[in-house]
């Protein structure tokens, strides 16, 4: 999760899939740590932001009657940490909410989504929130 409006609908979708398949949801927020800092640096503002986002996601999942585990990770780059954690935990599916972003007037998914799509050890579903 990244704190975008797409996260809420993605979690609702994940809850529907988890209930149907008797699965469990694991939501992760990755704090990207600059190379000038130690990887375990306590960046209070980012930690607070991540915890708030995860608390909100947890509330949504609980309202849906879903079992959810949340985790706050710190890494130099979010994409490899998502893939590595998925492999380590043996997840069956990665579901990512994607917001509409443009670069040079063209739709872009940024750097994280393409990396996860290419390197994930499991299936990946992208949820794109409709443009209002």
PLM feature spans:
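Structural beta-sheet core signal
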Residues: 27-29, 96, 126
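Short glycine-rich, flexible loops that bind phosphorylated cofactors or substrates
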Residues: 6, 78, 102-104
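Glycine-rich, Arg-bearing micro-motifs that act as flexible, cationic patches
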Residues: 96-119, 129
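Active-site phosphate/pyrophosphate- and oxyanion-stabilizing loops and adjacent acidic/basic residues
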Residues: 15, 83, 114
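Small/aliphatic-rich secondary-structure junction motif
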Residues: 1-44, 60-69, 119
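Structural beta-alpha unit
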Residues: 62-94, 131-132
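Short, flexible loop segments at boundaries between secondary-structure elements
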Residues: 122-132
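A short acidic, glycine-rich active-site loop
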Residues: 42-52
